[in-house]
């Protein structure tokens, strides 16, 4: 299992963005980006399945901006369900992407999965962040959609997930 990753993406942060980033403690980063033809594969892991899902959501948002520049000014909740763990992960990420792209332009600094009901495949989560603003947050690459292509959920001793996102 990989260790916590250091964010090496260069966003050419302004002094104001660096100041916001320094204002809050860094959020644990247990994810990486894997090369994939024309898309990006997210690989996230955690001590629990909940943490692996959280990290996958943060990997998705981390591809769109430096989440360290986001201030936890608002709270957004997402509840979703699926037919199995893969569809639950898909709908979880899709709902968070909707909060960003179509609904509130909400970008989280942190996402926390409050519970996963693995019997009925339901999930409750919460995120702390703010409305995305180009004047405040560096622009990464837009995530257009979540895909089922090569999606994997390993719910074992060291849970990990793999998801391809369409960019």
From Swiss-Prot:
A GO CC term assigned to this protein in UniProt: tRNA-splicing ligase complex
Single annotated GO MF: metal ion binding
Chain residues that bind Ca(2+): 39, 166-167
Xref: InterPro entries: Archease, Archease_dom, Archease_dom_sf
Keywords: Acetylation, Calcium, Metal-binding, tRNA processing
Domain of life: Eukaryota
Tagged with keyword Cytoplasm: no
Residues that bear N-acetylalanine: 2
One Gene Ontology term from the biological process aspect of the record: tRNA splicing, via endonucleolytic cleavage and ligation
Database matches in SUPFAM superfamilies: MTH1598-like
The UniProt record lists the keyword Cell cycle: no
Pfam families named in the record: Archease
Subunit structure: Component of the tRNA-splicing ligase complex.
Function of the protein: Component of the tRNA-splicing ligase complex required to facilitate the enzymatic turnover of catalytic subunit RTCB. Together with DDX1, acts by facilitating the guanylylation of RTCB, a key intermediate step in tRNA ligation.
Similarity annotation: Belongs to the archease family.
PANTHER family: ARCHEASE (PTHR12682), PROTEIN ARCHEASE (PTHR12682:SF11)
The protein's name in its UniProt record: Protein archease
Source organism of this protein record: Homo sapiens (Human)
């Amino acid at each position: 299992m990989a260790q916590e990753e250091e964010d090496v993406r260069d966003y050419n942060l302004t002094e104001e963005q660096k100041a916001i980033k320094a204002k809050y403690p860094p959020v644990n980063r247990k994810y990486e980006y894997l090369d994939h033809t024309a898309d990006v594969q997210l690989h996230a892991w955690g001590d629990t399945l909940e943490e692996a899902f959280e990290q996958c959501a943060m990997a998705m948002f981390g591809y769109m901006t430096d989440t360290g520049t986001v201030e936890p000014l608002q709270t957004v909740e997402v509840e979703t369900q699926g037919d199995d763990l893969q569809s639950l992960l898909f709908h979880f990420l899709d709902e968070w992407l909707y909060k960003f792209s179509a609904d509130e332009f909400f970008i989280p600094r942190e996402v926390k999965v409050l519970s996963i009901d693995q019997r009925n495949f339901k999930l409750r989560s919460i995120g702390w962040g703010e409305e995305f603003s180009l004047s405040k947050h560096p622009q990464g690459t837009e995530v257009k959609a979540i895909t089922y292509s090569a999606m994997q959920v390993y719910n074992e001793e060291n849970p990990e997930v793999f998801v391809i996102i369409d960019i």
